[in-house]
Structures are given as C-alpha cells and as structure tokens.
Amino acid sequence: MNANWENCRSMVLSVLRIAAGYMFMLHGSAKLLGLPHVEMFDGLQLFSLYGVAGMLELGGGLLVLLGLFTRPTAFILSGQMAVAYFIGHVAGNGYALIPLMNGGEAAALFSFVFLYLAAAGGGKWSLDAMLCKKRQG
C-alpha cells in the first residue's frame, strides 16, 4: 500500500508542477509576447518591473513545466510571487492578510505552490529525475 501511495504521490506532484509551470508561463507570455492579449501589457518595456517579471514567468515557468532545475527555479519564483504580493497587492491597501480583498490570490497561491515544489522537487515525470537516473547508472 505504501509503495502505491508513494508512486501516486510522485505522479500527482508532477501534475501539480506541470500545471503550475504552464499557467505561470501564460502570465509571462501575456506580458512579453502578447499571447494571450492583455491590454494592460500593451507597450510594456522589457526592463521594467513587469517586463522582468514576465521574463521570470516565461523562462521560469518553462523550466518548472519541464522539471529542469526545479528546486532552485521554484525557490526563485516563490520569492518573486511573494514580492509581487506585497508590492502589488498589499502596498497601500488595508487588507494585507486577506488576499480575497486585495486581489492577490493568484500571487499568494503561486508563491506557496512554488515553495512546495522547491522543497519537494520535480517529481517522477521531470527532466531532473531523468538526469538523476542517467547519472546513477
């Protein structure tokens, strides 16, 4: 029973990683490539705060999606989302600890999901796991 649960846990971890990476990539893609088009990002400067966030979201999201360098990438992205939460949603708002009221649900959830991935790793279906197997024999 424990072996089955462990196998299932690793697969679910991989599904969480793939889904989070894909959704995060969409945020970066919207900022940098206009896909999907989000009007507020029209004319976005690459080296602005949003532009740098978009680079992290697109590149980091791709790495997380693939499960390559999952732990360090997820750690950086968790920090990015924590900063985004406090700068973009809490600053000047009286609802610091109520994401529903300050619009920061996505940033808070991404931050905690990436923190979990930084601790847990990429899971069974990751390039990290494949490379680790290759090195071991």
Where are these regions (language model features)?
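Membrane-interface interhelical connector segments
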Residues: 33-50
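Extended, low-polarity transmembrane helix blocks
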Residues: 1-33, 50-55, 59, 66-137
